């Protein structure tokens, strides 16, 4: 039951971060492309790579893994919003933007998970 509290606390932080980052990206770039979702997915993927690698090279407590990996990063990143935004772009006739959104989200996020892991592995 203790881990549930860590997930909830991490989730509340991740959700607020996602909201604030999305607002900032909307102010900076406008609403023509879903940069907020892209940024939180890239950031969350990088941090997931770091957390995964830290778990490989050191002892991370189950509470830390629950707090950061499941709670904070689970709430920060968003596959459902990404999917909905991609579909909306297609429905609006913005096929190039929709494809770009899918390719960049998936490709960059996989790459930054790798970068996060390599950052940790190069230090240990």
Swiss-Prot record:
Swiss-Prot/TrEMBL keywords: Cell inner membrane, Cell membrane, Ion channel, Ion transport, Membrane, Metal-binding, Sodium, Transmembrane, Transmembrane helix, Transport
Function: Fluoride-specific ion channel. Important for reducing fluoride concentration in the cell, thus reducing its toxicity.
Biological processes, Gene Ontology terms: cellular detoxification of fluoride
Membrane topology: Multi-pass membrane protein
Residues that span the membrane, as ranges: 4-24, 35-55, 62-82, 95-115
Name of this chain's protein: Fluoride-specific ion channel FluC
Protein activity control: Na(+) is not transported, but it plays an essential structural role and its presence is essential for fluoride channel function.
Lineage: Bacteria, Pseudomonadati, Pseudomonadota, Gammaproteobacteria, Alteromonadales
Family from the record: Belongs to the fluoride channel Fluc/FEX (TC 1.A.43) family.
Coiled coil ranges: none
Pfam families the record matches: CRCB
